[in-house]
Regions:
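Contiguous beta-strand/loop segments that form the cofactor/metal-binding neighborhood of enzyme cores
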Residues: 1-66, 75-108, 114-161
Length: 161
């Protein structure tokens, strides 16, 4: 189940995603929360972009190659900081298409995390909640969200599998 509360509170424009909100992802055995505010004038005093809270501690990161690991009392256990760049990821993707190179990250993994963003957006744009069957990969009981599941394509541009 995915729930979302929030809205467009800062800019009155045609953007289709909220500038402030919180998503809750209930996986049955655990819950993940996403809290964001892209238009708040006050920024966080600390630089982490994402924090993962687990049973044994907290991992904070601001990029894919920088992280800090803390125990439950806030004591720093480990820190890793490397220069980052998206260039190797883009090059790997292009080489996978052109030369059959193995992807550094499987496309299915990216699809799962992207799906969570889409489900949260569907929840926000409909009644605030979306139920999803991961085995069947189908929405459950939300006809308004189901209308957002796929798009209408112009004639001649329909995807063919």
């Amino acid at each position: 189940r995915v729930t979302y509360g929030g809205g467009r509170y800062h800019f009155d424009d045609d953007q289709e995603t909220p500038d402030t909100g919180m998503a809750s992802f209930d996986f049955g055995h655990c819950t993940a929360m996403w809290d964001q505010s892209s238009c708040n004038r006050r920024r966080s005093e600390t630089p982490p972009f994402v924090s993962f809270y687990g049973e044994g501690g907290v991992l904070t990161t601001n990029t894919g190659q920088n992280y800090t690991l803390y125990d439950l009392d806030g004591k720093e256990l480990e820190r890793k900081s490397l220069p980052t760049s998206d260039a190797p990821h883009f090059a790997n993707f292009v080489n996978a298409i052109r030369n059959g190179e193995k992807l550094n990250s499987e496309i299915g993994d990216a699809q799962v995390s992207t799906l969570l963003c889409h489900l949260a957006n569907m929840a926000w744009r409909t009644d605030g909640a979306v139920d999803f069957d991961p085995a069947k990969r189908r929405l459950i009981g939300n006809p308004a969200a189901a209308k957002l599941w796929a798009r209408d394509y112009r004639p001649g541009w329909e995807p063919r599998v």
